[in-house]
């Protein structure tokens, strides 16, 4: 199997090379030439690690001994034996993706990505040091830092928007330990940060960074996206095993969405054979995806809002490019759309393509007040505590269920622990909020009895190690400077 750029199908790479590079030379994203269709029914009988290895082997067939990579990636890192528990809450199900070492769904992929990159490096015969560049809207950063910490032959720089992540998310990153990690705040929003990283990939060559190869831990890297496909199959298998559905029944998934990677993984699962019903795209006040899926017009020329669900505060959803490539198969068309987005800030898809999009995806959005009401209501009725991102998805799922009433089970993806956003959650419960984030954590625990994840509780004792703040125009110079330093 070959991977090809979304913008030029002639630019191909092996699966391992695609994982190593992260992004294609023309700025496009790597996609498999064809998505493999699995004997998904046989997967229903497998444990999570075996299921993961089989799915990833189909997508990345040149990797040897995927089961061993999966075991090493996940061994001892998650707080529950079930990596991604599915729980019944009221009239729907919640897929808990926050049981990993940093309490966010990114752990599922970023526990494994270092294994994939390390083996790809060996397979490609690369002796250069790998420098992982990552832009984060909050959760990817810490998960990537933890995943790549002290991995031999690898360094990682994480950029995050200054003032654009929660206090807990920031504390997770700036206290990060490891001899190969750097964290830097960028004055601007996540889109500025993500665009800066993409420009570095586009502009740097071997002469700029001798002895160094760049790669990415963002979901622009297919090695980050692929492991997320697994938990859709696993959630479906859990429903079958529990007798809630029969094999072949459809299931809807509602996904809080910013960069479109998590929900795209669900579409991959569907294309690989899983009986997915609707994929429901849930946005916060930054509702560029809701508008796009409703009208076919993608327009980033709009006000950027800082919300209580900061990991979704995104106006340029990178993985949407992959979906457009999948639905059209036309690299020149996709390249033209991305050119329009970059140069004039918007594009419009054809009516035919909009119909294809709407045949697969539903959408909705809500603001912070609606999400807060949902947090309070779900706790009062179900004694289930959810974070603001999950609350956005729950609210949009409410809209969908009210409109359709088709009796098909709905799974809400819960992407982060409520303790990553304790101020927003405690406030939503009608409680007074202190200035100190750790005091708020304690108050939230006292109010609900829900345990604080150990990795978050321990943050209050950790010293700050990373204090760099730069302008977005200085990101390239920062990378060149740090890449040239022997010791971090």
Question: Over which residues does each language-model region extend?
Answer:
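PLP-dependent amino-acid enzyme catalytic core
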Residues: 1-488
């Amino acid at each position: 199997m070959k991977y090809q750029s979304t913008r030029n199908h002639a630019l191909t790479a092996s699966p391992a090379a695609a994982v190593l590079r992260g992004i294609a030379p023309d700025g496009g994203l790597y996609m498999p030439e064809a998505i493999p269709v699995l004997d998904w029914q046989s997967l229903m009988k497998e444990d999570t690690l075996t299921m993961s290895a089989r799915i990833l082997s189909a997508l990345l067939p040149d990797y040897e001994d995927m089961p061993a990579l999966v075991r090493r990636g996940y061994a001892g890192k998650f707080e529950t034996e079930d990596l991604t528990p599915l729980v019944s809450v009221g009239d729907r199900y919640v897929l808990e993706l926050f049981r990993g070492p940093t309490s966010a769904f990114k752990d599922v992929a970023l526990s494994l990505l270092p294994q994939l990159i390390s083996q790809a490096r060996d397979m490609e015969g690369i002796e250069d040091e790998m420098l992982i560049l990552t832009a984060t809207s909050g959760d990817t950063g810490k998960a990537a830092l933890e995943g790549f910490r002290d991995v031999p032959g690898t360094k990682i720089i994480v950029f995050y928007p200054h003032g654009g992540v929660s206090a807990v998310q920031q504390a997770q990153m700036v206290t990060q330990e490891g001899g190969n990690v750097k964290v830097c705040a960028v004055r601007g929003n996540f889109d500025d940060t993500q665009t800066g990283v993409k420009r570095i990939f586009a502009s740097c060559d071997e002469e700029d960074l001798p002895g160094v190869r760049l790669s990415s831990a963002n979901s622009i890297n297919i090695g980050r996206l692929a492991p997320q496909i697994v938990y859709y199959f696993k959630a479906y298998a859990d429903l079958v095993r529990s007798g809630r559905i029969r094999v072949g029944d459809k299931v809807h998934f509602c996904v809080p969405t910013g960069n479109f990677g998590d929900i795209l993984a669900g579409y991959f699962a569907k294309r690989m054979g899983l009986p997915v019903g609707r994929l429901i795209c849930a946005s916060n006040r930054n509702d560029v995806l809701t508008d796009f899926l409703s009208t076919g017009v993608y327009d980033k020329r709009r006000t950027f809002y800082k919300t209580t669900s900061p990991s979704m505060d995104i106006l340029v959803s990178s993985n949407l490019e992959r979906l457009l490539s999948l639905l059209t198969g036309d690299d020149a068309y996709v390249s033209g759309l991305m050119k329009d987005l970059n140069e004039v800030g918007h594009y419009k898809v054809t009516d035919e393509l909009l119909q294809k999009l709407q045949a697969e995806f539903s959408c909705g959005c809500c603001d912070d007040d609606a999400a807060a009401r949902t947090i309070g209501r779900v706790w009062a009725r179900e004694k289930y505590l959810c974070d603001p991102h999950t609350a956005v998805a729950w609210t949009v799922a409410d809209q969908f269920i009210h409109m359709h009433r088709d009796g098909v089970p709905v799974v809400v993806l819960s992407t982060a622990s409520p303790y990553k956003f304790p101020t927003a959650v405690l406030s939503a419960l009608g409680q007074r909020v202190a200035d100190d984030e750790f005091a708020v954590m304690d108050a939230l625990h006292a109010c609900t009895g829900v345990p604080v994840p150990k990795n978050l509780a321990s943050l209050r004792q950790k010293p700050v190690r990373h204090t760099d703040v730069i302008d977005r125009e200085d990101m390239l110079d920062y990378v060149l400077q740090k890449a040239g330093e022997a010791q971090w």
